Each structure stands twice: as structure tokens, then as C-alpha cells.
Amino acid sequence: MRNNDDAWLLVIDPQVIFAAPSSDWAAPRFDEAMDVITGIAPLFGDRVIVTRWVPEPPYRGSWQAYFKRWSFANRPSDDPIFALVPAARSLSRFDPVDLPTFGKWGRRLESLLGPTPNLVLTGYATDCCVLSTALAAADSGALVRVVADGCAGSTDENHAAALHLMGLYDPQIKVVRSRQV
């Protein structure tokens, strides 16, 4: 495992939609994970990227059924529900990477970080966007560490299940605690 000298902290979707208790997608441990994220971010200096999930109509294929099921999230991308939470706004010197997909790894991040970066993943929700990002990044050759206590799932059970699944990809994906970063 490489050290943090070349590692990038990727903070997945620290947005109001996952933080607000009134949201259908509220992550019950959002604040606990955010405390971990803000605690480890200084270890990465300028190597921090924050992402946002934002819808991008018109919806094609399975996204049509998805937004029928989760109609509350079918809003303009500038709706306040998609804003970064205050604690995330100053984490990165870069503008947030906005994408309409669960997985954030792809051409945009690859152009910023290179094809096979050393990634440290945190964010929301463990069982959706973090999982999707980790698998795609590892599949393309990135070394991925997922900070278990720097993520929050839709439920504690789903969080644990997603961490278990990602742990099956060792050595490409390692699940660690913040004290190991």
C-alpha cells in the first residue's frame, strides 16, 4: 500500500439531500462521517476532490423508473437540496465535480487525477455512490482505500453490507478506519 504522499481524498456527495433529516435519503450517521472527513482532509493538503450527485434530465433508460420511484429528487440541479453542506464547502480548492451518476469515477476524475491514482474514499451513501465509485475506480486500476468511519449509509445495516462487499476486492479496495489513513 502506498502512503498518503500521492493519495487523493475523494469526498463523495456531502450534500443536503443526504444530511437533512427530512430527506428520504438522509444518512443517519451523516454528521459523524462528516466529522471524520473534516478531521482527515488536512492530511491531503490540496489533494481533495468533492463530488455532487445532481440529476440531469431528460432521463433515459432505467433512470426514468428511478425518478418515478424517487420523485422527490427530480428537481433542478441548482435546488438547495443538492448544495454541499457547509462543512464540505471549503474542503477542496477545486470546484465540485458534478455528475448525474452514482459512480463518480470516470473521464472527469481521471483527467484530474490520472488513470491509476491512489484514492481515499469517504462520503455518502456507502451503499450507493461510494460503492459504485470504488468498484469503477478499482476496475480501472486505481488503488482504493474506503474510510469506513468517513462514510455513512442509508442504514447502518446497508453501510456494513457495502463495506463487506468492497472488502471482497482486496487488494484493489481496502476498507480502513480513519486512524489508518
Language model: regions and residue ranges:
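N-terminal nucleotide-binding beta1-loop-alpha1 segment
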Residues: 8-14
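Active-site-adjacent betaalpha module
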Residues: 1-8, 36, 42-43, 72-181
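Short acidic, Gly/Ser-rich segments with clustered Asp/Glu that frequently serve as metal-coordination loops
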Residues: 15-21
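A short alpha/beta connector and helix-capping loop motif
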Residues: 5-7, 22-54
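Conserved protein kinase catalytic core
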Residues: 19, 58, 155
